[in-house]
Every structure is written in structure tokens, then in C-alpha cells.
Amino acid sequence: VVGNVPGLTVEAAQQAALGAGAKVVGSTSFKLAEKALQEIERARPDMVLLTGGTDGGDSATILHNARMLASSRLAMPIVVAGNRAVAGEMCEILGRGGKEIRRAANVMPRTGTLAVEAAREEIRKLFMERITQAKGLDALTGLVPVVLPTPMAVLEGVRLPIGGGQAARQ
């Protein structure tokens, strides 16, 4: 998780990631330094969630972070879920760096307003496309109606006794 401020966009990004079933192996805030980028590379995450700035707010930090990620050796998808005003520019920067990009709505469009669902859904899609295949879970697709990350499965399990969860309706 890469974000601007530890208690704001980084926290929102962690909520999105954890709610989608991702394992957060690290987080960094403010402008990415070379040392922090090396730590991300060493952690070898399945994906990076790039967040920061409210919509129309600070753009310098997230653009700097996009440039740092673009120039890195990281070879995993990057989910961009930050300042909407510069989302296109971030994707362009990352694309020029040869990165696979997934775009989602800002996890914190306004200070104090969490909007993690779009990022959570992109992370879940990546989980389904990549992680399940890499871990051999794709073999279950014909045997069960849907494969869910553990946190989502637990939430669905809680919903079932009170009227049926989303997975039960599929």
C-alpha cells in the first residue's frame, strides 16, 4: 500500500485491501524514497495499491510515487485509487514504465470520506484472475459456485443466516 498520509489514505487503502482478501505486506506514506521502493521490491507483493490525495487536492505526492513505481523493477499490477484529478496522468506515467494498471475510484475522495468499494472490487478481480491461478485454486472454479478471499467469505457467511449473501444468490 502506497499512500500520502498514514492515518488517512494509507488507512483507507489498507481497509480496501484487507476487505478484498489481500494480505498487506507493507505500507508507506508520503513521497516514496529509494529505500522504501527497495523494501517494496524485496517484499514481492502480488500487487501494489497506489493511493493518495483527495480529489482535486495534493497531486505532487501521488505523481512522484507513480514516477518512482514506473521506474522500478516491480513486475506486478498496480491498482491506482487516488486523486481523480490526476488519475489519467498517473496511469500514463505507469504505462510508460511498462506497468500493468488497474484503475479504481479514489479511496478517499474528500477528507474523512472513505470510498473503498471500487478499489476493493479491483483487488478482488485481481485476486480471482491471478492469485487463485497461481495458488492452484482455479481448479475449484467448476466445483464451487464462486471462490472468495477469506474476509469476503466470512462476511458472506455472516450474511447467510440473515437473508443470504451475494455468493448465495449466484
Where are these regions (language model features)?
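Nucleotide/phosphate-binding catalytic cleft detector across ATP-hydrolyzing
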Residues: 1-168
